[in-house]
């Protein structure tokens, strides 16, 4: 019945050629497709709002990160009539291409070490605006740009919301390491409490480990639920061979989420110690 309500114009033809199982699969795919369309539209809306509400009118240097939602950030910035008045600093290869593809001027952080504002994505966000980043293996340059910025704005979809870091992001904390040290660091990380540590592989695209833009390796260390991200980050940074970690603490000003409903939720870190649901309620 649901199938016939969704596609009444195809009722006779499709019922003739598809079994009930095929019909159910088609409906499931259609619902999933519509859901993903809503999410994608919300991501775009979140990115546009983030730019419109936060970009200083006289900004001269803008940081642009990576991620599926940041694509829309670059798109929105590329629509600005004064885009020739500022330069954009990338956090890696993908964001460099986003800058170029949207007709923006590409700058280097060596030439522009002070950045007015940066926009980036995240793999997971808790209510205190702590982040896990580095799923795209760009964490060091992302943190460099973020730390050089007067303001960091994060854009993502609702699936990145979490009560605690490590609750939804199960791949572990990304850690950029000097290649020669990775074996020793695996042992060090386990001694610090990591349940598992994996050297990230290139998969089908590359035989062997992932190589970062800085010619380093990425270790993914699963610490489970992370109650104190700042403390863990400081412990990890003390290990010889660690370049930086994917734990971003005390650096984010605001987060824009594209919701499944097609709406946008914002977190600003004002509500402390609340559950994700309470923060969402406060934000709407």
UniProtKB/Swiss-Prot annotation:
GO terms for cellular component: cytoplasm. Coiled coil: none annotated. It catalyses: aldehydo-D-ribose 5-phosphate = D-ribulose 5-phosphate. GO terms for biological process: D-ribose metabolic process; pentose-phosphate shunt, non-oxidative branch; pyridoxine biosynthetic process. InterPro entries: NagB/RpiA_transferase-like, Ribose5P_isomerase_type_A. Keywords: Cytoplasm, Isomerase. SUPFAM superfamilies: D-ribose-5-phosphate isomerase (RpiA), lid domain (SSF75445), NagB/RpiA/CoA transferase-like (SSF100950). Pathway: Carbohydrate degradation; pentose phosphate pathway; D-ribose 5-phosphate from D-ribulose 5-phosphate (non-oxidative stage): step 1/1. Its main location: cytoplasm. It is found in: Cytoplasm. It holds the Pfam family Rib_5-P_isom_A. GO terms for molecular function: ribose-5-phosphate isomerase activity. Its EC number is 5.3.1.6. Belongs to the ribose 5-phosphate isomerase family. This is Ribose-5-phosphate isomerase. The lineage of its organism: Eukaryota, Fungi, Dikarya, Ascomycota, Saccharomycotina.
